[in-house]
Design a protein with these regions (language model features):
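Acidic/glycine-rich phosphate/pyrophosphate-binding loops and surrounding catalytic core
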Residues: 89-146
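Compact, glycine-rich, soluble single-domain proteins
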Residues: 5-100, 105
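DNA-contacting interfaces and partner/effector-binding or oligomerization modules
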Residues: 1-3
Length: 146
């Protein structure tokens, strides 16, 4: 089986560096699935979850790894994927209560209909909170199927 090297980094540092059988990422136009020997690609990322299926020799199957990115850039080469994220974290480090509170706060700001800049900021915060909550739901569903 082929493998592809994956590197996920943010301004804070490296989050993941390893080999994968498959990677899924939230590109601007929708989720993309990337396998080894994928055609070169450069695209923006929107807030959401990155799923990495680790490469394992033989017929063994490893648990998927989940990461949250707040946006950034995805570069794909046939044998390497680089994700340069604005903010990135392991999904296990996400705080569901904090994300829910951020979602509520952003919705309240949108209801106030303040300036265009404040509306854009609230929309970005709402998108980030919704993406975190969606990723947490995916992880819960994945845990139930194991």
């Amino acid at each position: 089986m082929n493998k592809i090297h994956v590197n996920i980094v943010s301004a804070e540092g490296e989050i993941f560096d390893g080999d994968a059988a498959m990677v899924f990422a939230p590109a601007q136009m929708g989720e993309v699935g990337i396998a080894p020997n994928h055609a070169p690609l450069l695209t923006g990322l929107k807030p959401g979850g990155v799923r990495v299926q680790p490469f394992v020799e033989g017929n063994e199957k490893a648990d998927e790894l989940f990461f949250y990115v707040s946006g950034g850039v995805l570069e794909v080469q046939p044998k390497k994927i680089t994700i340069l994220a604005d903010t990135a974290m392991r999904a296990k480090d996400l705080d569901g209560a904090a994300a829910e509170e951020a979602r509520r706060r952003a919705e309240d700001l949108l209801k106030e209909r303040t300036s265009a800049v404040e509306v854009a900021t609230a929309q970005a915060e709402l998108a980030a909170a919704a993406a975190q909550l969606h990723l947490l739901e995916k992880i819960k569903k994945a845990a139930k199927t194991r």
